Amino acid sequence: SLTKAERTIIGSMWTKISSQADTIGTETLERLFASYPQAKTYFPHFDLNPGSAQLRAHGSKVLAAVGEAVKSIDNVSAALAKLSELHAYVLRVDPVNFKFLSHCLLVTLASHFPADLTAEAHAAWDKFLTIVSGVLTEKYR
């Protein structure tokens, strides 16, 4: 679980991130599809060209879910339960993709907030996103 210091870091950075959530979400997905093209197979009905309306809409949803997890940092499992079920039972997303997405989000945060993403903040976000990924894959077990 996260320490009080880690929660503080995530909460304070989230206030900055949330004002740019759509851009960051879109960039994160663009980075995911460029780095891990196999992830595109889950979006056969999407226009996956950079900046497409569908990519922007889904990027916005991804960051909204991260925001829900930040808001419910003490109970991420409850906050993301429906999303976990959707990805496990309906969409059947390979769990490794959540690790890939987390990595791409960290890289995107580093590019937008270089001064804020210190080693300590990077470690806190990595730990937090590992918790989020764990919740999103817990229904697979």
From Swiss-Prot:
N-acetylserine found at: S1
Residue(s) carrying Phosphoserine: S52, S72
Disulphides: none
Pfam entry (one): Globin
InterPro entries membership: Globin, Globin-like_sf, Globin/Proto, Hemoglobin_a-typ, Hemoglobin_oxygen_transport, Hemoglobin_zeta
GO cellular component, one term: hemoglobin complex
Gene Ontology biological process: cellular oxidant detoxification; hydrogen peroxide catabolic process
Binding site for heme b: H58, H87
UniProtKB keywords: Acetylation, Heme, Iron, Metal-binding, Oxygen transport, Phosphoprotein, Transport
Modified residues annotated as Phosphothreonine in this record: T28
Entry similarity comment: Belongs to the globin family.
Function according to Swiss-Prot or TrEMBL: The zeta chain is an alpha-type chain of mammalian embryonic hemoglobin.
Assembly information from the UniProt record: Heterotetramer of two zeta chains and two epsilon chains.
Protein name, entry field: Hemoglobin subunit zeta
Annotated organism of origin: Sus scrofa
